[in-house]
Amino acid sequence: MKRIVAALDFSNATPGVLEMAASLAKAHGAELHLLHVLEPEPTYTAYGFTPDEFPAIHTFQEEARKRAKQKLDEVAAEVPDGVSAASAELAEGSPLQALVDFIKEKEADMVVLGSHGHGVVASLLIGSVAEGMVRKALVPTLVVPAPGKG
């Protein structure tokens, strides 16, 4: 095993995902690649609106991007000594598709992700990402439960 991807949603599952991925990376001498996926800007074209009609959406998305990058940098700083944290990247788009693309790009041998996100909507979304990864089975997939789950 040479490359492990840790998919991070910044929920209460994130510390466990990072700990498990880092432990596996250290045990196998593998590179650790961190990924967080930011949802794309909402579009309301079905209602006849264009994104340019709502500059606040762009401002909100840019602020979300900055905060996500800051949080990703904070999490990357928590990677233990002895683990090669090769990259910490922020992607935008569909979480499942972005994760699949990242795994292919990095030629990862394994992915570690949390079973549920934060909040009702996020937990459904992240749950569906975990389920999608297991179904696609591009690489071995380790799903780490959030504290209090299971």
What does each model-found stretch correspond to?
Residues 54-70:
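A short acidic, glycine-rich active-site loop
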Residues 10, 110-132, 150:
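Glycine-rich, Arg-bearing micro-motifs that act as flexible, cationic patches
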Residues 74-111, 148-150:
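Structural beta-alpha unit
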Residues 35, 87-91, 142:
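General small-molecule cofactor/ligand-binding pocket signal
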Residues 2-54:
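Small/aliphatic-rich secondary-structure junction motif
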Residues 36, 114-116, 145-146:
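Short secondary-structure boundary segments
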Residues 49-53, 105-106, 129-130:
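Short, hinge-like loop/turn segments at secondary-structure boundaries
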